[in-house]
Amino acid sequence: MVKEYKGSHSGEHGDGIVRSEFHKKMFGEKITNAFEEIKDTFDKKNLLNPGKIVRPYKSDDRSLMRYKSNYKSEDIKTNYDWSEWGNFSDAIEMCNNNGACRKLDSGVMCPSYRVTKEEKDLVRGRANTLRLALSNQLPKDSFVSKEMYETMELCVSCKACQRECPMSVDMAKMKSEFLSHYYKKFSMSIKDRVISNMPKLIWLLKIVSPIFNKIKNLPVISNIIRKFGYATEREMPTVQNQFPLKEIYKSQIKSENKVILFADTFNINFEIQNLMYSIKVLNKFGYEVIIPSFDNDNLKRPLCCGRTYISYGQLDKAEEELNRFVNYILVNGYYDMPIVGIE
């Protein structure tokens, strides 16, 4: 039909395996033979993309495909709900190898690849490694292994892939799922343990904050934290006094329209200006702001979104934090109150 109506069987994506076998029908034997002569002149050993355009493979040859006739992926027990895709393996297989994550110009995806230029540090590389492990094409127990950890390690969980990948592959969520299995078999490093438990450890830092803020950028401190695996190219954050924030909070407008401002661990301890400006903006729109733990709500420590736990696969602890937040809403009767978070 395409030939009858003088159409083209290929376009911007080229010919490849799918269309090459139809060249003789479309172009005729004379032109097809000319293609072969050009190929043989410049590529005598047939090294450059063999089986495409010239002397093509059959498009339905399963031996050429990632999914062979005997392909079967393992349906493992997961901590996240992957039913939207079928299961975890099906979600991984959403990566169709289009390579959009290899771009170096616009957008954000994929930050680790933009630095290393290595396929293994790419969304596609990680997805393929996970897929090969769960379809038993890698050595036994490869899914929960140190090699898989190395593959996933440089993913910064920015979720750019979920936004910019044509298939919306969510590698940040997949990494979190992987780590939830990995840390049941292997112990966490001190560095990862400190960051993941920051919501519970921050009170220790606050006790020594006057001293910490003065010495944190000294060379001797940089040498110490480097040994634990932290990057020293950036300055360590300053632990901030919450007094200015509490002053603005107490002096804000009173209104029937109330909103909960979720003061996460990092904003309330290291970047209180974000919360201060947020209160002012919300007040301008006629909202009175409620910050959990700043009122008489009997919280032993500030509420936490569980983000650090999620990033390190500590999903049981993340669930604990989310349950604390739900309980806070229920106890105080804030069922219909809007919740604002700061990214």
Predicted regions and their residues:
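Catalytic or ion-translocation cores adjacent to nucleophile or general acid/base/metal-coordination motifs
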Residues: 2-5
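Ferredoxin-type iron-sulfur electron-transfer modules and their immediate structural context
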Residues: 8, 16-154, 172-173, 177-187, ...
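Iron-sulfur-cluster electron-transfer modules
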Residues: 139-343
